[in-house]
């Protein structure tokens, strides 16, 4: 949260060069960006849109739009793969642990994003 707050405050500090939207690499950074915008007197999403990535449970509280990357499912699949490897007598499985797994993502639109206002 703190890193997102500091970075957003720096980006939004000069209104002449301020962006219309911020993409954050994690929801926690997004929470900080929303707070920084509010502390600078900006309205989210009227003045600045904020979107992040994770699908953190607190995202709903903050109204943060997010790209939910199914982290719980990813962790469960990783644990299952590890158990399979540890319990296997198959030398091929033990020697070839690289595996490509794709996950669906969900765009969760909440109140932190809006279309850019027209001038």
Predicted region positions:
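Conserved active-site histidine-acidic residue motif and adjacent donor-binding/catalytic loop
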Residues: 1
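Flexible loop/turn connectors
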Residues: 9, 13-118
């Amino acid at each position: 949260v703190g890193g997102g707050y500091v970075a957003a405050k720096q980006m939004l500090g000069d209104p002449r060069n301020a962006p219309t939207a911020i993409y954050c690499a994690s929801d926690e950074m997004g929470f900080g960006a929303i707070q920084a915008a509010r502390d600078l007197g900006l309205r989210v999403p009227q003045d600045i849109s904020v979107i992040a990535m994770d699908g953190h449970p607190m995202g709903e509280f903050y109204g943060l739009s997010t790209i939910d990357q199914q982290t719980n499912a990813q962790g469960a699949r990783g644990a299952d793969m590890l158990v399979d490897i540890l319990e296997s007598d198959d030398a091929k499985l033990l020697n070839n642990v690289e595996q490509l797994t794709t996950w669906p993502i969900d765009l969760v639109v909440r109140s932190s994003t809006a279309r850019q206002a027209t001038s």
